[in-house]
Amino acid sequence: NGKGINLDLLNDFLEKRDELFLFKLHPATVVSNVSSIFSNIRFLDKDVDVYPILPFTDLLITDYSSIFYDYLLLDKGIVLFPFDYEKYICQCRDLAFDFDDYTPGVRAYSFDSLMEILSDWNYGNSLTTEQNRIKKIFWGDIPMQNSCKVLTRYIINNGSSNNVDL
């Protein structure tokens, strides 16, 4: 259907750029026809917790996953790849938020457009103004470097009768 990912082409592209692509698929997703071993592509096991890996990545490519909102905290580039958007929505897959309003940013609706975006991508890219707006809606104004201090203070000042000694 032309909407899937050509792993051979992607791997060749990654080899030339000395880059590694990590796939973390939805646990219900079954991968077929991945009989070759790719030098620059890894499929993470469905049980792997991807969150400890995220700070060491340069870019997130995602479809409808809520990881989009968590990755905003890293102030790194995000490419949305809803290649099956029409099919996804037609199957009455409810999203928690309006997809267009709450996932701003660069979008690729086909593998060809994804490859074009990756070819031109500047890995120094940070969040767009709209992505920062969404980050503020979900995470507030607290700078991440102070988050532990702010959370501790909140617990102490607003906690129940259980006191926290620090």
Which residues fall in each region the model found?
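A generic local structural motif
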Residues: 7-10, 46-49, 66, 93-94
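Conserved catalytic-core segment of nucleotide-activated headgroup transferases in glycan assembly
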Residues: 1-33, 108, 149
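Short, contiguous acidic/charged loop-to-helix segments that flank catalytic cores in large enzymes
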Residues: 43-51, 102-105, 141-142
